[in-house]
Amino acid sequence: EPVQQTSSPRPIEEITVVGQQSLFRLRRLVIEKEDEVFAYFNANNSSNRMDIICGKRVATGTYVPRRVCEPRFLKNLRSYEARSWRRGFTTTSYSQQDLLFESKGDFDQLQSEINELMLSSEEFANILADYADLTDNYAAHRAAMFKKD
């Protein structure tokens, strides 16, 4: 008997198939999604001070650059304190902990804005959920690859 096709107003669901991927490729996907999260947040937050900026930084004692993402207000404070110290305006150099403590009010505002955007924007909430899935997947693959037997 012939099969009768009926048209359905229901949209076709999207199915994504992911095969085995290298750890490098998974890390690349995490970074791309992270960039998407920050771009969306930066476009929708209250001020440029709250923007999240990513770049490469080489830690003291190593030549290996690492990706570091931080809010603009923290980057600006670090630059200001470093300039003050180099010019002799202060005798104390600030540690990362000192900078974080001094920026507590700004971090509270940043967290509030992220939460507010997540609750008010389904798109942002979905981007964050995708990011969480990717980071969990990366962590699981990394743990499996480097597990001790």
Q: What is each PLM-predicted segment?
A:
Residues 12, 47-51, 64-66:
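Extracytoplasmic
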Residues 1-16:
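Sec-dependent signal peptide cleavage junction
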Residues 21-32, 86-87, 91-149:
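Primary mode marks residue(s) on the alpha4-beta5-alpha5 output face of response regulator receiver
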Residues 61-65, 76-81:
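Extracellular/mature segments of secreted proteins
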Residues 12-21, 69:
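N-terminal secretion/transport leader regions
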Residues 72-79, 90:
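Amphipathic, hydrophobic secondary-structure cores in small proteins
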Residues 56-71:
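Short coil/loop "hinge" linkers that interrupt or connect long alpha-helical coiled-coils or helical hairpins
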Residues 34-41, 51-57:
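N-terminal post-signal-peptidase region of extra-cytosolic proteins
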